[in-house]
Amino acid sequence: MIDIWQEIYSTIKRNKLRTFLTGFAVAWGIFMLIVLLGAGNGLIHAFEQSASERAMNSIKIFPGWTSKSYDGLKEGRRIRLDNKDFNTTNKDIPDHVIKGGASVYQGGVNLRFGPEYVNLNLSGVYPNHTEVEVVKLFKGRFINEIDIKERRKVIVLHKKTAEILFDKTHTDPIGQFVNAGNVVYQVVGLYNDKGDSGDSDAYLPFTTLQTIYNKGDKLNNLIMTTKNLETIESNEEFEAHYRKVIGANQRFDPTDHSAIWIWNRFTNYLQQQQGSAMLRIAIWVIGMCTL
């Protein structure tokens, strides 16, 4: 045993440069493997964290343009979702829809408090909006069902918006009244988002915004939380059925996927998991090849 170690030492001593370069190459390979694993796992965890902040069983529906003629109507027709679609979502698919919601927008509104103002977008939403989007309420409350029913003039502001409007006067925003185009709203809540990016939307009750800004029965998008849909196949079947239901309202071909766009977070998550598994394998293969 001692002879073996002496021979190894003698070989290393005779080939110092080769030994150094070999050791450096191995160390560099290990270092690169650690870096790749760290970066890859960090990316995967970031995706998982983002996904965990929203309800996995949530779906958003956006209107599009028809690409097929149907029922005497030509292709290229714009689909405009409305309250009938909202009611259909809530009432006609009870086996799979827990709760439906909707959003309607009004852009470029000046919101004022005293001499201070900020230009932003108003979003009319339902209470379940926070289940689908990352809205981190940290003071006060969000829109509730009574606000919707009574069309209350209440508003939820982003943290940055509140700072612009109220910080100079050291005023607590909750309970204060702000003016938006000669309409006065009471601030009932403050929220923050992960990006903390400037002046984000201010939230109103859906029915309030739809009424004040003369939107009629039109809306911008629908949301829903679902149940009893645990596989990609069952979700695809539900989406096909939902296109058929909304297609009956809006008179478009149920197989026309451009008429409405369905963003299903559950199926996206499953696809993301498959992508993450492939990424892990790729990182290990590349890392081992560097050794």
Predicted regions and their residues:
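Alpha-helical transmembrane segments of integral membrane proteins
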Residues: 21-32, 280-291
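Peri-transmembrane interface segments
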Residues: 253-289
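Mid-to-C-terminal secondary-structure elements
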Residues: 128-143, 153-253
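Structural beta->alpha junctions
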Residues: 69-79, 112-116, 190-195, 224-236, ...
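Hydrophobic, regular-secondary-structure patches
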Residues: 41-121, 128-131, 211, 237, ...
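Generic structural signal for small/hydrophobic residues in well-ordered secondary structure
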Residues: 15, 43, 61, 89, ...
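N-terminal Sec/SRP start-transfer signal
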Residues: 1-31
